[in-house]
């Protein structure tokens, strides 16, 4: 009997040991999320968090948005918070600005920022200037968002980049996300900001999936407006970009790395207020600078960066003149081959970097 009892107790002890054993719990894995889904998730979380937030624009409700960025929000929040508007940018932008002045937090979607020109008086004269003109008594917490810059085959009237246009205006904050992390963190910060914020998205990036880090999956995740991010560390040259060209810069950096050239790639994230300190610190390390943007060259984002570097402490660290890579100084052509030659490509960035380094 003792032998039998020993046979029984042995497995029981082993089972007890298994029950007491502590297993390692790994952190939740990063998930793949498209830029479209990231913006949608960010808006959803803020709509849920604050009942003063609402979305309006053309086809944003029952149709789920022209680019499906607002998919599912109308079914969840209803007609009073997800509002379809007539095709009248001046009209619905004015309604949104008035709602912001009354204490709500509207998200005003333009089907493309080219159409925001129809509402420029509301954006600049009403939204951007009111806080200053009221001596700080009247905030205008509104987000103007939608696709910006070149798309594919939509020609001159649908392909402009408005980063420099809106970045020129005091009273506005201007953000320009590249990946899903940028998109979610910036839309949430923009909605919570008490100033008018212009969020320049990119139609060609909506369907691109990126890994969303664990911290970005939190409902409390925010990206500070006015802070750039170093996407790739390097020692030979600083390359600064925003929106879709950030990806082109990283591709160029990967190619050049095989040749022994290490590029430091900075994702601006915010156009205004610009994180010039991050750019200066990088230039002081690499001693070379290239800026990349999809907009026109004259009075552009790159021109502003170069001017600020020239006026600041980093200028004395440059070993060569800064070089800009921009869109061509023409209205966007319709033909694909001309369109491709009108916006910066990876080969153009590589050429500019080698030119700056005199290679």
Swiss-Prot record:
Recorded catalytic activity of this chain's protein: N(6)-[(R)-lipoyl]-L-lysyl-[protein] + pyruvate + H(+) = N(6)-[(R)-S(8)-acetyldihydrolipoyl]-L-lysyl-[protein] + CO2
Ligand binding (K(+)): 142, 190-191, 193, 195
Essential cofactor(s): thiamine diphosphate
GO terms under biological process: glucose metabolic process; pyruvate decarboxylation to acetyl-CoA; tricarboxylic acid cycle
Important for interaction with DLAT (site feature) positions: 319
Subcellular location: Mitochondrion matrix
Modified residues (Phosphotyrosine): 67
EC number(s) reported in the record: 1.2.4.1
Enzyme class, UniProt record, top EC level: oxidoreductase
One Pfam match: Transketolase_C
InterPro entries xrefs: PDHB_mito-type, THDP-binding, Transketo_C/PFOR_II, Transketolase-like_Pyr-bd, Transketolase_C
GO molecular function, one term: metal ion binding
PANTHER family found in the cross-reference section: DEHYDROGENASE RELATED, PYRUVATE DEHYDROGENASE E1 COMPONENT SUBUNIT BETA, MITOCHONDRIAL
Subunit structure: Heterotetramer of two PDHA1 and two PDHB subunits. The heterotetramer interacts with DLAT, and is part of the multimeric pyruvate dehydrogenase complex that contains multiple copies of pyruvate dehydrogenase (E1), dihydrolipoamide acetyltransferase (DLAT, E2) and lipoamide dehydrogenase (DLD, E3). These subunits are bound to an inner core composed of about 48 DLAT and 12 PDHX molecules. Interacts with DLAT.
Name of this chain's protein: Pyruvate dehydrogenase E1 component subunit beta, mitochondrial
UniProt source species: Rattus norvegicus
